[in-house]
């Protein structure tokens, strides 16, 4: 068994528990690590080790999150669990812990509750692609019909937010009994693990996606032309390939005639690397920070979108006062700030620090964007909010 730990060949998948307060998310997290460590190696984590989650900072926002890891026969999982509802909201909006899939925990004794709905909605808005349901505390419900009713309610709720409710795997279990080592309930954790392995597809790695490089700096090198620098966000760029320059201005095409790193010429630049790309025939003044280089036809510039936003509280260094419709802050995408105006949902007059809210944004310049792109909201260089593009309008 001990040899298992050093195998880095298994695909890596990011998951997390979501759901209403006290429905058993943390107990389930502990149960998964405990049961799977018996079967596939790895470390068991006790409830209280997970529950006192350390504080982290993501984009200046304080979030309490616990990270655990576990293995199944075919995969390695990184799993996040948050103690408080506000932590989930912040986590999902900032993308601090990107999830390839989520385990929605619903207590069979209660059925779906307000945060159950809110977490499903957030999952939809921020692009959590797959949800598996763990119906918890089933040891406390004798009535088969009641279980079926709760299951039906959960499926309806998922369908309401465009998840495939009818096809979603639902496991009936008891996290506490599994944690206590009761075999019939341990079996349910293995069933959950099986669904994780089969229902959540292996995520596409950044390197396999189409090339994208957010431009941080632009230089002109006499006799050679214009060089842009930045960190490759996804994909690979090779010398000789055609790229588009997208955002802020009209989209144009150019050819990359050289890729360098630390002043050395490379054959290619790969996701995660900081590179300089030499562009053929592009003038220094035609290109600026905030644009992106991308594989032609893979990303388009937009100004108007629907977003899900978390507004920092005063304690987090955010605003001390609410804002109203017509608010005009800067929206920081990748490497640059763009001014934009906001529209609030009908019936919402103002937004308080610490709130999360759905808002429609209209930028003064187009930015290269996809649904799921994260941004910060800033006033004079200070971050006052974090958001994610939920739906592109134009």
Swiss-Prot record:
Broad class of where this protein is predominantly found: cytoplasm
Region (G3): 81-84
Name this protein carries in UniProt: Elongation factor Tu
Keyword Cytoplasm: yes
Positions bound to GTP: 19-26, 81-85, 136-139
Region ranges (G2): 60-64
Region annotation G4: where it falls in the sequence: 136-139
Source organism superkingdom: Bacteria
EC number(s) stated in the UniProt entry for this protein: 3.6.5.3
Residue numbers spanned by region G1: 19-26
Gene3D superfamilies: P-loop containing nucleotide triphosphate hydrolases (3.40.50.300), Translation factors (2.40.30.10)
SUPFAM superfamilies: EF-Tu/eEF-1alpha/eIF2-gamma C-terminal domain, P-loop containing nucleoside triphosphate hydrolases, Translation proteins
Keywords tagged on the record: Cytoplasm, Elongation factor, GTP-binding, Hydrolase, Magnesium, Metal-binding, Nucleotide-binding, Protein biosynthesis
Span of domain tr-type G: 10-204
Residue sites binding Mg(2+) per the record: 26
Keyword Ribosomal protein on entry: no
Family of this protein: Belongs to the TRAFAC class translation factor GTPase superfamily. Classic translation factor GTPase family. EF-Tu/EF-1A subfamily.
InterPro entries: EF-Tu_GTP-bd (IPR041709), EF-Tu_GTPase (IPR050055), EFTu-like_2 (IPR004161), EFTU_2 (IPR033720), G_TR_CS (IPR031157), P-loop_NTPase (IPR027417), Small_GTP-bd (IPR005225), T_Tr_GTP-bd_dom (IPR000795)
EC top class, as a word: hydrolase
Subunit structure: Monomer.
GO MF, one example: guanosine tetraphosphate binding
